[in-house]
Amino acid sequence: MKLYIHKDIFYPDAWWVKFKWLFDKKYKDINYEIVNLHYENNINDLQIGNDDYCICRFGHYEEDFELSKRVYPLLYEKFNGRIWPNKEDWYYYNNKKRQLEFFEKNNVPHPISHYSYGREDFTEWVNENNLEYPIVVKKSQGAGSEEVDLVYEKEYSWYDEVNRKKKFFDETDWDVIDFPSIIQQYIDVDYDIRIAFINNKVLFLKRFHQWKTKNKDNFPYGTDKKPIEKKLKYKLAPYEEPRCESLDEKEILKLLPIVNYLHDKFNTISIGWDIIGDIENFKVLEFSYIFQNELRDCKSYYDMKTKEIKNLDYDKRLEFTFIQNEILKSIKEISYGS
């Protein structure tokens, strides 16, 4: 088996550097090549064996995503489906409309939601579902909490000359919405939970919603904007990371029925689900394959093989190749059955 690793040139924290480190230090028996797979000529020139495998880190940075959309079908065909992210992972990545369709098709609990094309459609949906403002609005494309806002009703007033009194009416603040968008029931919670399946490990992270007391422009996490120079240089999300907290063993045990439920719905090498609520009334907000070491705050994980909760020691949590290592272990298991 030979591995072909995408040279993700758009990001200073390039994945291929981390993979190269792993190959040189830990997986010396694996033959590999680093290739910029954004270009069709590079893909066409590859001499692929029957068991060769492709690993791509395609992010949601606009230029990267547009190039990736063009070449992914070619890569999938070239490697006969032996590619990470797989076809299903890629289909739902960065596309909240498709994720909503997945929820509806598979009866996954989620907030009342709708893909809205305009004002009339928006108003009709709010009234039909007897929803109260605010309403959550999400761009149909975008990862995580980017492009997510709360929409309120604005109060308008005018003076009635005939009756000589001031009158008022409320109307949706349309300026906040860029149609078409996902519109969603607002559920007031203090935090959400990221449940991340990485190979056979399940990690949990509580992320606090602080928009009410901190930065109200950043719903729901309330963190400050990143310096523009840093954001542009490293192709980062616009806001700082939310305040996070690891779950203790009791909290994890309570979530295991949800873990098994989600695993049955979508079983893949690396995927993260954002949920709110508990086992009695949990709802899924969105999901996506994971390519970032975003779970460094986790202190433990659930082992899907042994059905045990295990400690994740400090060095492991900070290991900069954690996700890359788990992906390689999973691919070796698929290829060699060990």
Predicted feature residues:
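Active-site nucleotide/adenylate-binding loops and adjacent lid/helix of ATP-dependent enzymes
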Residues: 4-6, 90-181, 252-253
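Conserved N-proximal alpha/beta basic substrate-recognition cap immediately N-terminal to
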Residues: 9-115, 124
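C-terminal active-site "lid" helix and adjoining low-complexity regulatory extension at the edge
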Residues: 240-253, 264-268, 277-338
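Short glycine-rich anion-binding loops that position phosphate/pyrophosphate groups of nucleotides
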Residues: 59-62, 140-142, 290
